[in-house]
Amino acid sequence: MKVILASASQRRQELLIRLCDEFDIMVSDFDEEKVVFKNSIDEYVQNIALGKAMDIKEKLKEDAIIISADTIVTLDDKILGKPKDEEDAFNMIKLLQGRSHKVYSGVVVINTKKDLILKNSVATEVVFSKMNDNEIRKYIETKEPLDKAGAYGIQGIGGIFVEEIRGCYYNVVGLPLNKLKTMLEEAI
């Protein structure tokens, strides 16, 4: 059966290759702003991922396995999504530096043939080293932080500022592979 990744993220595409030899990419038009945060961060990221997957499901004319994900960063119960601009990125990194934060990914796998929907989430704790304003600005000049939740990429230059991680590394990159592997085995 065809596998579809509902994401434009290059990082997610690179990670999924480790689990699937072949897959197609379809980018969802789902408006993440429609999802309202209620009580649980886990539920919130799962609902965003579900919205993306359902958007793709509605567009399909054939059966498929659909994979979608959403990743956010939280600090002191505040959600840090992708920065709006360089100043927003600076402020996010300034908040994170020298502290511990959590990265949450919601993952959804849909088997349209079985009409099966699996939802899950993974949380990883990340500790950032202390950084001065000059280090933060130099990092932002690379443009790496601008399209990433929490304004950093652990798999890129941003990784040099990570002091410690507790949990799934791939979750911080954007696709928790171990959890996804288990979900795919259940879906197929």
UniProtKB/Swiss-Prot annotation:
Cofactor requirement: a divalent metal cation
A biological-process GO annotation: nucleotide metabolic process
Main subcellular localisation: cytoplasm
Enzyme Commission code: 3.6.1.9
Record keywords, A-Z: Cytoplasm, Hydrolase, Nucleotide metabolism
Annotated InterPro entries: ITPase-like_fam (IPR029001), Maf-like (IPR003697)
Catalytic residues as annotated in Swiss-Prot or TrEMBL: 70 (proton acceptor)
Site (Important for substrate specificity): 11, 71, 155
Top EC class, one word: hydrolase
Molecular-function GO term, any one: UTP diphosphatase activity
Subcellular location: Cytoplasm
Catalyses which reaction(s): dTTP + H2O = dTMP + diphosphate + H(+); UTP + H2O = UMP + diphosphate + H(+)
UniProt xrefs under PANTHER family: BIFUNCTIONAL DTTP/UTP PYROPHOSPHATASE/METHYLTRANSFERASE PROTEIN-RELATED (PTHR43213), BIFUNCTIONAL DTTP_UTP PYROPHOSPHATASE_METHYLTRANSFERASE PROTEIN-RELATED (PTHR43213:SF5)
Role summary: Nucleoside triphosphate pyrophosphatase that hydrolyzes dTTP and UTP. May have a dual role in cell division arrest and in preventing the incorporation of modified nucleotides into cellular nucleic acids.
Similarity comment text for this entry: Belongs to the Maf family. YhdE subfamily.
Record's protein name: dTTP/UTP pyrophosphatase
Native source organism of the sequence: Clostridium botulinum (strain Alaska E43 / Type E3)
